[in-house]
UniProtKB/Swiss-Prot annotation:
Keyword Lipid metabolism assigned: yes
InterPro entries linked to this entry: CYP450_sterol_14alpha_dmase, Cyt_P450, Cyt_P450_CS, Cyt_P450_E_grp-IV, Cyt_P450_sf
Lineage per the UniProt record: Eukaryota, Viridiplantae, Streptophyta, Embryophyta, Tracheophyta
Membrane topology: Single-pass membrane protein
Any one biological process term the GO annotation gives: methylation
Protein's recorded name: Obtusifoliol 14-alpha demethylase
Compartments (UniProt record): Membrane
Entry's transmembrane regions: 12-32
Gene3D superfamilies cross-referenced by the UniProt entry: Cytochrome P450 (1.10.630.10)
Pathway listed: Steroid biosynthesis; zymosterol biosynthesis; zymosterol from lanosterol: step 1/6
SUPFAM superfamilies, per database record: Cytochrome P450 (SSF48264)
Length: 492
């Protein structure tokens, strides 16, 4: 038979099969060669060398991690097409992940898909030295003196928002808290001008930005799909809005108590002030870092306290004790006294960290030792991952790890500290711990302090589940509650 007699489609399929076979052969050959010598490589998940890991990963990262942790242990490698992702699960093996410097363990390569959202010239679009200076701007904007002024705004927003509720009723707690969180973030982060005059417009633009981060965006952030086009249009419009606000503030000489003002006033070490584009990008990054975590965690905290009513009752009693000392006043220092509420929030975050995976790019070989004493060499070039969602439920660290038990963080137990550093990683840790952690706790505390003092609640919908389909794991469906207004009575 002549080659010309073979249908074109069959020739294409045969050629494709040959290419795939060649790739597989080369991958196997390279794997065999790299496995030689004295390197103790982590076990690789079984399956097809090129696409097996991808298939398992796409079925769900957490089920995959659970399955491979049981089969292979706390260190294993997942081949995904041309990349190799090595998972380090648990504090015994993840220390270098969190403590390694940027030359060894880099964020930039694995998080560059955020560049179209945050914009040029900020965070993952700049080299490490510039990024560190920009993180210094965040740190200065979140110092204790700044947080004190933010708390006043958080409390004012909560009081205004819940004053619109009736004497009793039924609401979707998830929707209500999501809406309040974005209002509060607009006031504290984006500024008075946005909160008072442009909230609806800016909120819609941030919605388009948020929806512009799809699973496909991680691999192809510039793919011309409708979600990306809406993202780019929204990003351009936000740049125009904030440029106008920045120019107005500078022209009038006015200064506000918000993160926007902090970024406007920030300067690099060489004396250069921030540009309008940099300020906009840093604000977007700040809102993305905090909005989802606060709204999701505030809802989970409420759902758990209403499901396990003893913790709701303990939180109410704590409010009574605080009110005996301070009356109705709520400020930064008073919120810091609320240990019961803090533990309720922290436990909700342990069970439901919004980010299911943290990633780094390895730029040098390193070695890890498991709790069983096995040593593995992690090669340069691997993507290295750990999972807060899975690591926060390890049974050798947390007793009854799937149970909601805020007292596990109380005096005498402190399970997260007993197991050592990086046992609780809802906010990351080490060199790249979340800068907004104090802000998040204050925001959630301020909201629930107002609710505990002014309302009774009953959870009337089924207990919620995780929404695994979202890039940031949220809550599936509605969280319906009955509420009844009441004023907390304090016995003197």
């Amino acid at each position: 038979m002549d080659l010309a007699d073979i249908p074109q489609q069959q020739r294409l399929m045969a050629g494709l099969a040959l290419v795939v076979a060649t790739v597989i052969f080369l991958k196997l050959l390279l794997s065999f060669r790299s496995g030689g010598g004295k390197k103790r490589l982590p076990p690789t998940i079984p399956g097809a060398p090129v696409v097996g890991g991808l298939v398992k990963f796409m079925r769900g990262p957490i089920p995959m991690i659970r399955e491979q942790y049981a089969a292979l242990g706390s260190v294993f490698t997942v081949p995904i097409i041309t990349r190799r992702i090595t998972f380090l699960i648990g504090p015994e093996v993840s220390a270098h992940f969190f403590k390694g410097n940027e030359a060894e363990m880099s964020q930039q390569e694995v998080y560059r898909f955020n560049v179209p959202t945050f914009g040029p010239g900020v965070v993952f679009d700049v080299d490490y030295s510039v990024r560190q200076e920009q993180f210094r701007f965040f740190t200065e904007a979140l110092r204790a003196n700044k947080l004190r002024s933010y708390v006043d705004q958080m409390v004012a927003e909560a009081e205004e928002y819940f004053s619109k509720w009736g004497e009793s009723g039924t609401v979707d707690l998830k929707y209500e808290l999501e809406h309040l969180i974005i209002l509060t973030a607009s006031r504290c982060l984006l500024g008075r001008e946005v909160r008072e005059k442009l909230f609806d417009d800016v909120s819609a633009l941030f919605h388009d930005l948020d929806n512009g981060i799809q699973p496909i965006s991680v691999l192809f952030p510039y793919l011309p799909i409708p979600a990306h086009k809406r993202r780019d249009k929204a990003r351009a419009r936000l740049a125009e809005i904030f440029a106008t606000i920045i120019k107005s503030r500078k022209a009038s000489g006015q200064s506000e108590e918000d993160m926007l003002q902090c970024f406007i006033d920030s300067k690099y070490k060489n004396g250069r002030p921030t540009t309008e584009g940099e300020v906009t990008g840093l604000l977007i990054a700040a809102l993305f870092a905090g909005q989802h975590t606060s709204s999701i965690t505030s809802t989970w905290t409420g759902a758990y306290m209403l499901r396990f009513k003893q913790y709701f009752a303990e939180a109410v009693e704590e409010q009574k004790d605080v009110m005996k000392r301070h009356g109705d006043k709520i400020d930064h220092d008073i919120l810091a006294e609320m240990d019961v509420l803090y533990r309720c929030i922290k436990e909700a975050l342990r069970l439901h960290p919004p980010l299911i995976m943290l990633l780094r790019q390895s730029h040098s070989d390193f070695t890890v030792t498991t709790k069983e004493g096995k040593e593995y060499d992690i090669p340069k070039g691997h993507i290295v991952a750990t999972s807060p969602s899975f690591a926060n439920r390890l049974p050798h660290i947390y007793k009854n790890p799937d149970s909601y038990d805020p007292d596990r963080f109380g005096p005498g137990r402190e399970e997260d500290k007993a197991a050592g550093a990086f046992s609780y990683i809802s906010f990351g840790g080490g060199r790249h711990g979340c800068l907004g952690e104090p802000f998040a706790y204050l925001q959630i505390k301020a909201i629930w302090t107002h609710l505990l003092r002014n309302f009774e609640f009953e959870l009337v919908s089924p207990f919620p589940e995780n929404d695994w389909n979202a890039m940031v794991v949220g809550i599936k469906g509605e969280v319906m509650v009955n509420y009844k207004r009441r004023k907390l009575v304090v016995d003197n």
